[in-house]
Curated annotation (Swiss-Prot):
Segments in the Cytoplasmic topological domain: 1-136, 189-209, 276-289, 387-880
Polar residues composition bias: residue spans: 641-664, 760-770
Species of the source: Oryctolagus cuniculus (Rabbit)
BP-aspect Gene Ontology terms: apical protein localization; cellular response to cAMP; general adaptation syndrome, behavioral process; neuronal action potential; potassium ion transmembrane transport; protein homotetramerization; regulation of membrane depolarization; retinal cone cell development
Primary role: Hyperpolarization-activated ion channel that are permeable to sodium and potassium ions. Exhibits weak selectivity for potassium over sodium ions. Contributes to the native pacemaker currents in heart (If) and in neurons (Ih). Participates in cerebellar mechanisms of motor learning. May mediate responses to sour stimuli.
Intramembrane segments: 339-360
Family label: Belongs to the potassium channel HCN family.
Comp. bias (Gly residues): 62-71
Primary gene name: HCN1
Regulation affecting activity: Activated by cAMP. cAMP binding promotes tetramerization and formation of an active channel. Compared to other family members, cAMP has less stimulatory effect on HCN1 because part of the molecules already contain bound cAMP and form homotetramers when cAMP levels are low, this inherent tetramerization in HCN1 results in a weaker response to increased cAMP.
Name of the protein in its database record: Potassium/sodium hyperpolarization-activated cyclic nucleotide-gated channel 1
Mode of membrane association: Multi-pass membrane protein
Amino acid sequence: MEGGGKPNSSSNSRDDGNSVFPAKAPATGAGPAAAEKRLGTPPGGGGAGAKEHGNSVCFKVDGGGGGGEESAGGLEDAEGPRRQYGFMQRQFTSMLQPGVNKFSLRMFGSQKAVEKEQERVKTAGFWIIHSYSDFRFYWDLIMLIMMVGNLVIIPVGITFFTEQTTTPWIIFNVASDTVFLLDLIMNFRTGTVNEDSSEIILDPKVIKMNYLKSWFVVDFISSIPVDYIFLIVEKGMDSEVYKTARALRIVRFTKILSLLRLLRLSRLIRYIHQWEEIFHMTYDLASAVVRIFNLIGMMLLLCHWDGCLQFLVPLLQDFPPDCWVSLNEMVNDSWGKQYSYALFKAMSHMLCIGYGAQAPVSMSDLWITMLSMIVGATCYAMFVGHATALIQSLDSSRRQYQEKYKQVEQYMSFHKLPADMRQKIHDYYEHRYQGKIFDEENILNELNDPLREEIVNFNCRKLVATMPLFANADPNFVTAMLSKLRFEVFQPGDYIIREGAVGKKMYFIQHGVAGVITKSSKEMKLTDGSYFGEICLLTKGRRTASVRADTYCRLYSLSVDNFNEVLEEYPMMRRAFETVAIDRLDRIGKKNSILLQKFQKDLNTGVFNNQENEILKQIVKHDREMVQAIAPISYPQMTALNSTSSTATPTSRMRTQSPPVYTATSLSHSNLHSPSPSTQTPQPSAILSPCSYTTAVCSPPVQSPLATRTFHYASPTASQLSLMPQQQQQPQAPQTQPQQPPQQPQTPGSATPKNEVHRSTQALPNTSLTREVRPLSASQPSLPHEVSTLISRPHPTVGESLASIPQPVAAVHSAGLQAAGRSTVPQRVTLFRQMSSGAIPPNRGVPPAPPPPAAPLQREASSVLNTDPEAEKPRFASNL
């Protein structure tokens, strides 16, 4: 070359099209321009390097040291196609292996097991296809489409079309035969499932032997390219050969019918089920839809085959005069009309409703009709059986409910229950089970702990959201509490709890309205989110009120054992329950020595820390806010009650002395045992008054507490049970008025109105009590000074009025109870009223007045009506 050295003979050029162009020396006399033109160098480039645009290779046509760079460039370009080929090979190989997806994870158990299965496919041999691979999935989908097309189109083409050489028909047959031949080859390289061990067989020799023994003969015969042979020999054959070809096509149709394999259909159903899970479809609904479509499709396909067979048999006989086609003069009609009549005849036979347009006359039609009836009866029985099982599986819980209620109806008929009771039982089952029965406890027990807790929290999410106690509690405590709940339903008028019964459960209202019935005329309503009955669980006492369902109530109950089991693990929540219970009792002027002793013990041991103190403050604050929300509503009624006359009975004329107010800093441990100087004088009664102790430590006695107290609803949406006393019959202003002696007879007309003063406040007759003395409730052991008179409202379980011991006075009436009879009640000391969270100080504006010598101390009127803003401040949390 002129002006340059020889080109590097070892360097070759290779573009991205995987073509290699060796650099050849130019011919003699060609000149450098020709060589540069062949190499793609622009003219006039001289000794400059030539470079093609795009992905071409750079060349150095200069002599000297450019040979090494040219060689390196050629090797790099050669690696590109190799990497591309390796990438394609890896992608195709991965399609032959099972992928890591939801279906494979469910089949093999874990991702590691799937990876192990992938390694088995790699080591099994070349072109071994896993039965759960993506490639096999898409291939089976193509085969399904081809099978449906063949099973529908080929019978119609063979039966109703004489010309088999049209272009669409040839294309369809060629394509289907090619696909079936490829499927025949792939079946030798596809792993099979071992039915005994459910393991995928990947050994080529075992796969080949299993396929040869099972479906190979049927697939090979049905995959013979009859259409190809027919196209080759068609021109050299006469009409007789054409008839032979038609007979071969019939054989082809028979072979195609054998291609419908249950294994492929079942595998397809599994894939469809996998898609349904991916799209978050319901399992029952999805499986039911698939089964319905499979059943309907099978019935329609059998009717289609039978219709083609009805016309094919006369066709093979060249339409004899006694066949149904000739009798109906349909030999030369269009194929659509012929197919319609044939299908109608087939469906009439299969459904056993007739013989179609024409009754069978010839022997061949007779046998075809009997065959159709047998097949139709079998299919009809299968259809009815599958449909029945399908309907039952769609809603098994409703079916169980119907079976259960039939047993209930038989039970009611056997015992001859009245109609109203039967209606109540029917309504209970409707509201309790709502038409479905399932063993929820068994279902939850079969789940693991995280899933079970998640379900319980979801089911009770609205209940938790409406309860302040749960809002400030530990989430683990809430979960443990909810997992112990038991669902119950009560009808309107049902007593959920009864007064005087031993408390074994507490209740949480999910939906409904319940009323708290006390011995007074006032009632409290409980709605969604409220709970009640926890005080008896804490004190192991008896119910002090009855709760009756006003509407259908859906409740969650918690037994005392489960309650204590949960609170043992969360002592702070037990103290929270006890704090709320003390606060509630104190707001109605009652106390419980068990709760007070526990609280005093915890206070002395110093278990209350700052964090727990803040939590208890919030809980008590929520409970008090609900009481304050209902207090303005009840204030006018209670004011009217306060303004009425109180001269109905001697006990109602007793005044209440306002005890002095003590601050929290003035209380100490020594105050618990230091008696007040003004109360050290013994009382004439055999029972010493608990108010012989300081008023900062104990509360003054209350006259007829059970007859003058009632429950009040805390808030229209409250979740707490608030207890509020009614106002006493006399206002606080005339407290300094001297008390009349109890022996003064009752003045006619001076009694309070019937709707304001309870009937139990009337004077006792001179005779003895109507019933024996009822023991004090175990849930209120700290109230020996609180006595009850006759109660107008009877106990729910007793049809008579109850009697209790009246308050002892200095001068006992000659016909009243003797002091010796009252001395059997043990003396009890009320502990530390100031420490209770609900202790609201009395009105400081009224100075205390000394009581008459013959009259015991009285508790002042309900502190709920106290309008002093300082008195309404909660003092419990500050004492913690």
